[in-house]
Amino acid sequence: MSKHYFCTLLMCLMFVVGAEAQQFTDIGADLTGLSEGSARWIDTDRDGDLDAVVMGEFFKGNQRGVQSNLYNNLRNDRFSRVSSGLPNLHRGDFSVGDYNLDGIDDIALIGETADGTRMATIYRGTAVGQFQPTGINFVPVRDGSIRFGDYDGDGDLDVLLTGESKAGPVSMVYRNDRNNTFVPVETRLQGVRRGVGIWYDYNLDGYPDIFITGADASGNPFSMLYTNQGIGFEEYQAGIIALKHSYAAVGDYDNDGDLDLLVMGEAAQSRLVTRLYRNDRGRGFSRTNAPFVHVRSGFADWGDFDGDGDVDLLISGESSEGPVTRVYENNRAGRFSDLSANLIGLHMSTGQWGDYDMDGDLDILIAGMASGYQYHNKIYRNDLLLAAQASPSTARGAESETDIFNNSVVVPERGKPDFLFVYSSAYTDLYNTGTKAYFLFISPVKRPRKQYEMEDRYNKLLRETYPQWSIIDQGNLLSIGKPTQAEAIKSRQRVIDEYASKQFTILEINW
């Protein structure tokens, strides 16, 4: 995610599935291959499933192009490109959030058009799933990042921006004063390009701090954590390695209640580095010995792909041996293992975990450039649940390595469990008290009459009950089905007990 980690507990997997049975399948979504851009999941049409927005550069023959594409999720592994209203950009980034509090996701974006014009602005989401310009203008940049986040705790989303302006690298915070008004905040942040700036509440005080990494005006690698003091940001010397062509992702890999920091990029002497720093409860950071591939010019995202209650790592970029994309399984106690997922190796890449097929596990959206200047944009379906439900001979049968990436694979329609419940989680100031807390939102057990009926009803009631839902830092919407009502009720209670043990407040979305 991104930037966030997912509170994902698939309690329906109460048995062990061998690593050889875990696989990701290229669904052959026929998306335009792009690089040097950004790819994110977003539910633009608000129908309860994840659509995809991907922006970047591509070549077709000798013709160069720049696109920002919206793909509508038609379900059953089918996506259709639709009109979005977004400008075509590359060398950019975008962030999803409801800046105007109207209950519809908007997009903040930066980048460069095909004619070299740089821009940084917000496009407002509409009820029909398209986007419209707002006239909001930030310092135009390319080769950077943009992130929504409520740094001042006033209930609306502010903006953190980094990148290369015409005057050089910048890093800026814009305060949201509502009514389409954003005001630049005096922060004295180091300007960077070819890197990223992220909101990161490392000290758990409820106010997002800032981590910035990238190349400074002289091209030197830079990394710094800035503590949110309420009236400004102050440098915090955390000992994080200086990097450029870099990326950062936070997630609680050790399940101790604070967010740890992963950084990747190019250090001094052109050395490629990927490091995981353990957050020692806001009192400092400890470097770990996690065995991740060293990369630059890529991305990383934390997510619990195997549903065992801890976050795993998706990472992609340029290694010393060429483009790579890997999934590392979190084996706890600080140990990770390469899943050997056989995903396409990419650099100048972007992507994110997300459950596009709503089957309760995390799938992968990824775009970038492979060896030989080949542009790709793929969706990989997580078949962990399918493998777990199959017999050992089926799950580990005669499929070759290439079989699971066959773009012509016929995907069966999602099954219809007899009894189902759905749930999601969030860390937020739900009641506008000034204090954030962890919440679990869970439905009753029902017997759906058609596919996705539960998810659709749940989403509708959740938005009606909690209007700020679209701006909340959410976990995935998960669904669990059981053949009998008794089993489903037992599974639901197990989920509630697990989250309650982690001090989540349980909120029932009933109908």
Name what the model sees in each region:
Residues 37-46, 92-101, 143-151, 195-204, ...:
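Beta-propeller blade termini
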Residues 8-16:
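Bacterial N-terminal signal peptides
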Residues 442-446, 472-486:
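A short, exposed loop/beta-hairpin motif centered on an aromatic-Gly-Thr core
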Residues 57-62, 112-116, 164-168, 215-219, ...:
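Short glycine/acidic-enriched loop and turn motifs that connect beta-strands
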Residues 48-54, 103-105, 155-161, 206-208, ...:
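Glycine-aliphatic tripeptides that mark coil-to-beta-strand junctions in extracellular
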Residues 21-34, 71-89, 124-141, 175-192, ...:
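Blade-edge motifs of beta-propeller repeat domains
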Residues 352-354, 362-388:
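Blade-level signature of beta-propeller repeat domains, shared across WD40, Kelch, NHL, RCC1
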Residues 483-500:
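A short, charged, amphipathic alpha-helix used as a generic interaction element across diverse proteins
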